[in-house]
């Protein structure tokens, strides 16, 4: 119904209540005369008149397919309703659902259920209020009777029930429309004026953290780094800014640089460049003294050399938490709330992973035919928010961790931090091996179990199963040891086999000096896999119902030339054999580092047109990094070309940064879908790995600056003022899509540990929650919701946390390394006279210096401006600079 809405959320700076529903969606109160008082209603959306339906959303299961929208009700101007389109009824009544989650029913309370529902075809609808997951207890369900709908006739239902069970915070209000309930498809079902009323319940006040006008890295900045903030303002003139310390004293001031409309966020923005301020301290913040708004400030942040010192260990700890087949326990878990029993070790109710069969051939999702056999595939890492274990996703993740170690070893810092024995908080610490290799080995040992033996199937011996996962999807709020689903092996794939060959070859060379027996076994199995892939070069993991199945992600890949190149690179660097050298040198991907995937072919179909260098499905860049990093027998000119290609790709991303209002290295995709893709944050992280290598190989600090910009975007300098990392920032990630760390599902589950990064904005609307909560015309950078049900924007995965760990470690440890021919990043090159930092010395620098001396609020590079090198910037420097520009002085500094 169409009624005036009023804001009901109290705005309190500095306090954020972790709640299930995003304030931008639920904070508006309807005043419908048809419904009871909003504040006593357990539902947050009742009338749909604002054009959104969240937290109502749909669910598809067991063959069901549907779509939904909020639409105008014909013949009722101003009235809107939630419309569900049943496209395929599926096998069961729950195959198609519309539902509202996040409901707590309290014992002894009496509730009034009310809704109006209608359809354009004769059908039935089963409505219930009950548990979201096992055992699916129902507290109200119209006495188990579905409602009959007559075409075009509205049915209004009003019933009471008393909660006679213990208080339950895992409830949902659900309508089932599939299976035997459905009409002939397609058809529409409409819902409006829906309520769940309890006069004893009062909606809590939700405290909403305002978005400040000045967006910053909410954690902080390294002292030597380039430092930018982004100001949201439609002003076309520079704005005065002040930087204050924790004592509220102004320590620096200047004027913003207007940039105009930022395409990806649709914000009008300015930049603040405060790179020359290097004084370490905590609690700095910006103010805009001439801007008359309640949000003319920034969040507090630090300037410190140890910004990433703890974060890198938190990022690495994610992998211990995601281990399968081992109890997660203290003192390694970081807190008792994050401990759990071992998952999938063949103990009831688990049905894996000690004796997992190939996928049942009589199942509709069987896919490629397989012989029947069983395998022990215990161990490894759970991939993401589910309990699946996927070789291609595990491949790039474990490569990234091992590459961290290999780079550290080559750069001479493998004797400290996570690289040394005892450096990480894991059970294997102090066992004589580098801890990060111990963690990687947990995945490598699992990989070995996924390889097909001669006994199992001689026709594909040496090939590797693409993945192992549940037969059907499980609900959120389920620990691994509670998973009751049967688990099966999906068919082998060439991509998985080459991931296996690449990472086991990499593992072999890193372990040869620590555990020669293990290293030799890795290499033997890697070479067997290589030969198997050559024999079966086109077993693709296709995106079909058989390949994806209902219990795990598909990870489809229809091109494997990149994986062949990557595997050949790793095998060649490890063995030096001509077989691999000849293969990689004849590959179309030889020495390639994509700046935008698919430009030269060779990208997984899903990656074509996306800015970035590599993903689980596009892997040639990994091989090129190995060739550029590790000593090998390639011609020196080729190795230099690989390094140059790495720098060239990074240069293109630096150009993107200068074009983007929030200074990030990706832009909207250049494919038919455009916008930001699933896991957009991970594209930035992988770009930052390449930027790190560009700095290693060139010594040019501009690549370090690019890494700083990427981190600042991820940690809050973005269109949503969102830190996408748990435990870090004023507005951190709180509700990732995960089956254990899901307090939105139930209070009995813990909030996530710190150091986990979410996939981030995805403008392709690939889950019902984001589709229900965010309008389709929302700018790409703002297509995100911090909600546990939004798997397409808020998922967490091993292949995203791996580059996050890589980058945070790199930035934390960069002061330990000076790259060949480079400069110490703490002592950046001084270009005397270049006051405005544009790389040139001319009259504009004299103007900038004069304005600075006259205290006109301009920021300059004071190191460059001190042209007589006396440690001060004053009128003497201005006089010398003018003489230099007039060619009266030949060299600066001039004393």
UniProtKB/Swiss-Prot annotation:
Main subcellular localisation: secreted
Annotated GO MF terms: cellulase activity; cellulose 1,4-beta-cellobiosidase activity
EC class: hydrolase
Region (Catalytic), start-end ranges: 241-815
Domain CBM-cenC: from-to ranges: 40-199
Name of the molecule in the record: Cellulose 1,4-beta-cellobiosidase
Enzyme active site: 386 (nucleophile), 737, 786, 795
Family indicated by similarity: Belongs to the glycosyl hydrolase 9 (cellulase E) family.
GO biological process terms held by the UniProt record: cellulose catabolic process
Species this protein is from: Acetivibrio thermocellus (strain ATCC 27405 / DSM 1237 / JCM 9322 / NBRC 103400 / NCIMB 10682 / NRRL B-4536 / VPI 7372) (Clostridium thermocellum)
Domain Dockerin: 828-894
PANTHER family recorded: ENDO-1,4-BETA-GLUCANASE
Reactions mediated catalytically: Hydrolysis of (1->4)-beta-D-glucosidic linkages in cellulose and cellotetraose, releasing cellobiose from the non-reducing ends of the chains
Region annotation Linker: where it falls in the sequence: 199-240
Gene3D superfamilies: 1.50.10.10, Dockerin domain, Galactose-binding domain-like, Immunoglobulins
Enzyme Commission number(s): 3.2.1.91
One GO CC annotation: extracellular region
Alphabetized Pfam families for the sequence: CBM_4_9, CelD_N, Dockerin_1, Glyco_hydro_9
Native organism taxonomy: Bacteria, Bacillati, Bacillota, Clostridia, Eubacteriales
Signal peptide: 1-27
Keywords for the protein's UniProt record, in alphabetical order: Carbohydrate metabolism, Cellulose degradation, Glycosidase, Hydrolase, Polysaccharide degradation, Secreted, Signal
Subcellular location: Secreted
Keyword hit for Signal: yes
């Amino acid at each position: 119904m169409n009624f005036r809405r009023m804001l009901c959320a109290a705005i309190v700076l500095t306090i954020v209540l972790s709640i299930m529903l995003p304030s931008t969606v639920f904070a508006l109160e309807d005043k419908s005369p048809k419904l009871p008082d909003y504040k006593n209603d357990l539902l947050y959306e009742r009338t749909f008149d604002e054009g959104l339906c969240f937290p109502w959303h749909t669910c598809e299961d067991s063959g069901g397919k549907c779509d939904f929208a909020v639409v105008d009700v014909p013949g009722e101007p101003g009235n809107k309703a939630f419309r569900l389109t049943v496209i395929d009824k599926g096998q069961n009544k729950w195959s198609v659902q519309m539902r509202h989650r996040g409901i707590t029913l309290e014992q002894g309370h009496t509730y009034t259920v009310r809704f109006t529902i209608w359809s354009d075809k004769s059908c039935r609808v089963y409505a219930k209020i009950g548990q979201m997951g096992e055992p699916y207890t129902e507290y109200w369900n119209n006495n188990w009777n579905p409602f009959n709908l007559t075409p075009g006739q509205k049915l209004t239902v009003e019933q009471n029930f008393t909660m006679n069970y213990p208080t339950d915070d895992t409830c949902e209000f659900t309508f089932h429309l599939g299976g035997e309930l459905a009409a002939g498809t397609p058809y529409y079902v409409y819902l409006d004026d829906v309520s769940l009323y309890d006069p004893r319940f009062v909606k809590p006040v939700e405290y909403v953290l305002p978005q400040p006008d000045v967006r910053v890295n909410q954690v902080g900045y390294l002292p030597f780094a380039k430092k930018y903030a982004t100001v949201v303002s439609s002003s076309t003139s520079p704005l005065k800014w002040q930087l204050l310390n924790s004592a509220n004293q102004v320590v620096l001031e200047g004027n913003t640089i207007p940039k105009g409309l930022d395409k990806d966020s649709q914000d009008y923005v300015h930049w603040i460049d405060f790179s020359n301020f290097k004084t370490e301290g905590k609690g700095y913040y910006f103010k805009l003294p001439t801007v008359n708004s309640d949000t003319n400030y920034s969040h507090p942040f630090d300037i410190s050399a140890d910004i990433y010192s703890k974060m890198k260990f938190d990022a690495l700890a994610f992998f211990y938490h995601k281990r399968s087949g081992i109890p997660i326990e203290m003192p390694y878990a970081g807190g008792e709330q994050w401990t759990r029993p071992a998952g999938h070790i063949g103990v009831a109710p688990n049905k894996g992973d000690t004796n997992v069969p190939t996928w049942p051939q009589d199942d509709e999702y069987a896919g490629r035919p397989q012989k029947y056999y069983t395998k022990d595939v215990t161990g490894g890492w759970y991939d993401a928010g589910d309990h699946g274990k996927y070789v291609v996703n595990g491949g790039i993740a474990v490569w990234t961790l091992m590459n961290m170690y290999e780079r550290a070893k080559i750069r001479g810092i493998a004797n400290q931090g996570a690289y040394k024995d005892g450096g990480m908080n894991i059970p294997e610490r102090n066992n004589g091996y580098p801890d990060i290799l111990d963690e990687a080995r947990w995945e490598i040992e699992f990989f070995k179990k996924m390889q097909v033996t001669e006994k199992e199937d001689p026709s594909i011996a040496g090939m590797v199963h693409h993945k192992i996962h549940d037969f059907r999807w499980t609900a959120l709020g389920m620990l691994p040891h509670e998973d009751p689903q049967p688990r099966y092996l999906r068919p082998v794939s060439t991509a998985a086999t080459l991931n296996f060959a690449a990472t086991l070859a990499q593992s072999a060379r890193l372990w040869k000096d620590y555990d020669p027996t293990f290293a030799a076994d890795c290499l033997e199995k890697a070479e067997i896999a290589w030969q198997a892939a050559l024999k079966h070069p086109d077993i693709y993991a296709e995106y079909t119902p058989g390949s994806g199945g209902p219990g795990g992600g598909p990870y489809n890949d229809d091109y494997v030339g990149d994986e062949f190149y990557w595997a050949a690179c790793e095998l060649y660097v490890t063995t030096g054999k001509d077989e691999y050298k000849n293969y990689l040198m004849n590959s179309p991907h030889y020495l390639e580092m994509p700046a935008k995937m698919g430009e030269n072919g060779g990208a997984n179909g899903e990656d074509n047109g996306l800015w970035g260098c590599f993903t689980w499905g596009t892997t040639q860049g990994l091989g090129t990094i190995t060739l550029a990093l590790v000593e090998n027998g390639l011609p020196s000119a080729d190795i230099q070309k690989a390094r140059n290609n790495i720098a060239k790709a990074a240069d293109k991303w630096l150009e993107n940064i200068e074009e983007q209002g929030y200074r990030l290295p990706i832009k909207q995709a250049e494919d038919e879908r455009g916008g930001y893709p699933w896991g957009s944050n991970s594209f930035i992280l992988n770009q930052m790995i390449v930027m790190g290598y560009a700095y290693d190989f060139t010594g040019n600090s501009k690549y370090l600056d690019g890494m700083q910009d990427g981190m600042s975007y991820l940690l809050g300098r973005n269109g949503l003022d969102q830190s996408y990392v748990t435990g870090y920032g004023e507005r951190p990630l709180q509700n990732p899509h995960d089956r254990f760390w899901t307090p939105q599902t139930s209070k009995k589950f813990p909030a996530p540990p710190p150091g986990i990064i979410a996939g981030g904005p995805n403008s392709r609307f690939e889950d019902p929650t984001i589709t229900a909560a965010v309008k389709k015309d929302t700018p790409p950078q703002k297509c995100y919701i911090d909600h546990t049900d939004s798997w397409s924007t808020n998922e967490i995965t091993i292949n995203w946390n791996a580059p996050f760990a890589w980058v945070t470690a790199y930035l934390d440890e960069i002061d330990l390394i000076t790259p060949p021919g480079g400069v110490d990043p703490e002592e950046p090159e001084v270009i005397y006279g270049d006051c405005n930092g544009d790389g040139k010395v001319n009259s504009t620098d004299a103007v900038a210096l004069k304005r600075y001396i006259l205290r006109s609020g301009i920021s300059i590079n004071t190191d460059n401006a001190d042209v007589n090198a006396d440690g001060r910037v004053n009128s003497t420097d201005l006089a010398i600079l003018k003489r230099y520009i007039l060619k009266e002085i030949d060299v600066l500094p001039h004393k």
